């Protein structure tokens, strides 16, 4: 790309340089580096946080927030049990947790997706919509999950429930993209699934020599917690957000003072998800042996202490589902779950058996995966059920919806009964396999450790550098079976307009506040690196 520049209101200059190598290939993230600035500088700390929010300009909103149903469509009572088809307890336990995730269930029951889906085969959102609808509308019954849900994953033996859970979430996220294949990574993070489960990490490195700050932002769908030295979820989160000193051989190569210097590194949550998936790392990556210890977890969890912006009031989440593993190794044992129905009653979902439980029993389990939802979200859904309010979805005109329904053919696969055809199972198997998915996950696993990147060349003083990274999956043309994968991570190249939007500080959703101070007389070079 040729270098070019743009002056905006006589204040900002945009220059394009070659992209630096990213530390994590799967995510669209950005890094900010700046020199220490005077207190009244237009790039003061408060303004810098606001700028951090603008690192992901959205070219296309794939699932506008107003499209999410306002009120609950879920039945108040608990739904059906799930038949074990042979070593599929991990599938059943994961599906029950997703089924009782209020925003996801409400969206599925609204049938918003199936009315506009143009994929006739292998759509995970359509498959999950059929499953959730059957499960919630058949209380007291036992249903058989569709084979398409685990096609390409299940190999006749027990697998890891968390891996299957994220396999399904990733597949649903990919299903949101068929009509938007050329969108950038930032726009992909506006999908329905990311709006429900997603947020952004912020890894901040502060040079102790020049006090320059480097911020790296990375999207997440779940949060892995190390429980080796933790007795509770809160302790594990504190360890995750604890500042790390970088010195000696691990010293930071500062891109501002252009030397190796001691630094402090802190990992925090920059934006919060509607639904938090917390996975307790109970299994050894080498042996698969289980850390069979009791880790306390609360019914209500305040995430504010772990956010990038402190002192903004409590950010309370409430527990609504727990996935449990009983056994001594990830290679054997049994999975089941506890879920909270709409009316507030807890139930134990053990394959076909559905039994009432208590919060005391729920909180005494050796949990593997915890599901929390923002308290305001849970109360809103519960209130709509108690009032018996007629549900509706925002952002869609009723007349347009009726017209869309009239245009759909009766044999549209997305509107068929939950039992899917064999060709759908075969197609899903061809599109994604467990081994391929695990291979991608190893490359793309969200980690709290972020590699420090070296900034080449000499930078002028008081310069602001934004590194825009992009990921190319590495799928070659001579591997069509890889190109067709449900979990293929497509590449995207930031456009010139996207770079402009970054500089103009277009607001990204988050919790940061916009600075009120602005020096209109100074000019600072803004280098957008691709």
Swiss-Prot record:
Region (Disordered) location: 382-412, 477-530
InterPro entries membership: HABP4_PAIRBP1-bd, Papain-like_cys_pep_sf, Peptidase_C19, Peptidase_C19_UCH, USP_CS, USP_dom
EC number: 3.4.19.12
Enzyme active site: 89, 334
Principal place of residence: nucleus
Basic residues compositional bias, start-end: 510-524
PROSITE patterns attached to this UniProt entry: USP_1, USP_2, USP_3
Compartments where found: Nucleus; Endoplasmic reticulum
GO-annotated molecular function: cysteine-type deubiquitinase activity
Pfam families, per the entry: HABP4_PAI-RBP1, UCH
Enzyme class at the top of the EC tree: hydrolase
UniProt entry keywords in alphabetical sequence: Apoptosis, Endoplasmic reticulum, Hydrolase, Nucleus, Protease, Thiol protease, Ubl conjugation pathway
Gene3D superfamilies: Cysteine proteinases (3.90.70.10)
UniProt biased composition (Polar residues): 493-505
Biological process, per Gene Ontology: apoptotic process; protein deubiquitination; proteolysis; regulation of apoptotic process; regulation of protein stability
Superkingdom in the source lineage: Eukaryota
Domain USP: 80-375
Family from the record: Belongs to the peptidase C19 family. USP17 subfamily.
Protein name listed in UniProt: Ubiquitin carboxyl-terminal hydrolase 17-like protein 5
Native source organism of the sequence: Homo sapiens (Human)
